[in-house]
């Protein structure tokens, strides 16, 4: 079996009140990320335990987020600084703390979001769970039943989307039983050779003859140089192109 993970963008259709709540939730979440980022850099620590001690209570009391959202912000910031470390060798090499503006709200499967039996999406917000209408056309049926990972809630051009990574198991592709190689040319249009050691030649004699025929016609008409000859040249060119296809 082959395991494959793909991320699909799913369109959400919240009501105006729900959209406003999602806006406020994302703003609070990103503010949490900004605070954790400043704390992590000033204390030069990526320890989840230490960041919990330093930032968790402040996030809950200042931004009025739930426990899971506070933890999600801490985990996201740790992951982002680790990415900086991988690329620069030092997570603290940037002059300023990492900033979070419009990069969305991370949702953990079965904690922050889940799928209801009627296909709607249940999402954790500042005011508890909301149930949203979803357009599932962007995700193939097979991946709708895959193993979902941490999704990201985004607003693009005034429209809400959820980016969902889905992991599925695929059957191994069948190994080909017969392999054929094809060489293209002029004298022989194609020469094929297959796994049973059979060689087949496809002659280009007819094509060569046709090309010579049209070339002779064009040469004669070009020598005339009349208006009717030019119209005839164009007609012949179109006919030759159709024949070659």
List the model feature ranges, each with a label.
Residues 1-245:
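Nucleic-acid substrate recognition interfaces
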